[in-house]
Amino acid sequence: MIDSDGFRPNVGIILANEAGQVLWARRINQEAWQFPQGGINDRETPEEALYRELNEEVGLEAGDVRILACTRGWLRYRLPQRLVRTHSQPLCIGQKQKWFLLRLMSDEARVRMDITSKPEFDGWRWVSYWYPLGQVVTFKREVYRRALKELAPRLLARD
């Protein structure tokens, strides 16, 4: 599903532990790290997509987490030209994302990257909340900055 402007609707997931650290995942067979994220299917709400992606990419169920906050609007990034599939229709030039801040409520041992036949990640670690800003690929950096900034007050507010 790609909108009329060429952006694919997507959810981004910031999963925090009790210490306020966030889950940082390594893309399979790469040295690229990022937050879990994934597309929103037709007739699927952002929250439904969040739980589906959380399970597919991190192995967690709805009962393992609590939603602390969600960004108010869509945050967009454009793909670098080298990543745009110019022969695909409709043309996708980037992603528009709703970001969710989650608190892990179960044991971290439940995090599993290998429950699907095509895993996206092969490793993960806990990092400080702002660490991803200096590490994520450049074209996603501004969206990360905006999402982290908007959601930070909810992480700092003790539930």
From Swiss-Prot:
One of the protein's GO biological processes: mRNA catabolic process
Entry GO CC: cytoplasm
The protein's enzyme class: hydrolase
Cofactor(s) listed in the protein's UniProt record: a divalent metal cation
Keywords: Hydrolase
CDD domains (alphabetical): NUDIX_Ap4A_hydrolase_plant_like
Ranges of residues in domain Nudix hydrolase: 6-149
GO MF term set: mRNA 5'-diphosphatase activity
EC code: 3.6.1.-
PROSITE patterns: NUDIX, NUDIX_BOX
Motif mapping: Nudix box: 38-59
Family: Belongs to the Nudix hydrolase family. RppH subfamily.
Stated role: Accelerates the degradation of transcripts by removing pyrophosphate from the 5'-end of triphosphorylated RNA, leading to a more labile monophosphorylated state that can stimulate subsequent ribonuclease cleavage.
PANTHER family membership: M7GPPPN-MRNA HYDROLASE
Protein name: RNA pyrophosphohydrolase
